């Protein structure tokens, strides 16, 4: 059974990055091996540019990777996951921004080939919870209703967000039982010839 240490973990923040009180930043302090995906222009979310940055970082290692994304970082992660990245093993997509707000709906429409969990909030100003549930279905992801937590960011006062950490552990477990998971991470074996 895989553990969190089996994976390289990338943190993909949204618009304006995640400040020091954001749960993503707190998780990076708790887990120093987590790597942040740095964008050149945090105030200018261009899906293709942000996605290329994430894809580049994912391809720097063959180790299976999980992405912990927030807001526009979720759209970035989905866009990257819809391309061929063999070492992407799963995604935790927290409070995704509504793709319609950024006019990128078509670019992020498709079923993911890796396990994913979408976490939505009943009062998220960036995406109504019913739409978040619909997008989770489109992506083939599990949907988790986190209650009324706003945009699930620093303003939500979540501290280290223990519930979110439990969802990350759930994602880790899903990587071993997800259809196709074994084929994604094990290299093809050459048939042996008996003499």
Language model features by range: what are they?
Residues 2-63, 189-192:
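Active-site catalytic motif of lipid deacylating hydrolases and related acyltransferases
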Residues 28, 122, 127-141:
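Conserved loop-alpha-helix segment in the C-terminal half of the alpha/beta-hydrolase fold
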Residues 112-113, 117-120, 124:
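Short beta-strand/loop motif that positions the catalytic acidic residue
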Residues 86-99, 115:
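A conserved short beta-strand
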Residues 67-78:
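Gly/Ala-rich beta-loop-alpha elbow adjacent to hydrolase catalytic centers
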Residues 33-35, 137-153:
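Catalytic histidine neighborhood in serine/cysteine hydrolases
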Residues 49, 154-168:
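Post-His helix in hydrolase/transferase enzymes
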Residues 17-18, 99-100, 122-127:
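Acidic catalytic loop of the alpha/beta-hydrolase fold
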């Amino acid at each position: 059974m895989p553990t969190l240490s089996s994976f390289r973990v990338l943190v993909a923040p949204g618009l304006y990055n995640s400040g020091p009180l954001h749960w993503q930043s707190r998780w990076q302090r708790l887990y120093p091996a987590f790597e942040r995906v740095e964008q050149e222009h945090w105030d200018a979310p261009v899906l293709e540019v942000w996605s290329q940055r994430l894809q580049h970082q994912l391809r720097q290692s063959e180790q299976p990777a999980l992405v912990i994304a927030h807001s526009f970082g979720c759209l970035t992660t989905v866009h990257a996951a819809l391309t061929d990245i063999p070492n992407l093993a799963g995604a935790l997509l927290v409070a995704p921004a509504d793709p319609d707000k950024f006019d990128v709906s078509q670019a992020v429409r498709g079923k993911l080939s890796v396990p994913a969990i979408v976490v939505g909030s009943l009062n998220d100003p960036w995406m109504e919870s019913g739409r978040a549930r619909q997008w989770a279905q489109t992506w083939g992801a599990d949907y988790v209703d986190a209650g009324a937590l706003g945009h699930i960011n620093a303003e939500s006062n979540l501290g280290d967000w223990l519930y979110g950490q439990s969802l990350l552990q759930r994602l880790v477990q899903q990587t071993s039982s997800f259809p196709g998971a074994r084929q994604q991470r094990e290299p093809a074996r050459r048939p042996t010839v008996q003499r």
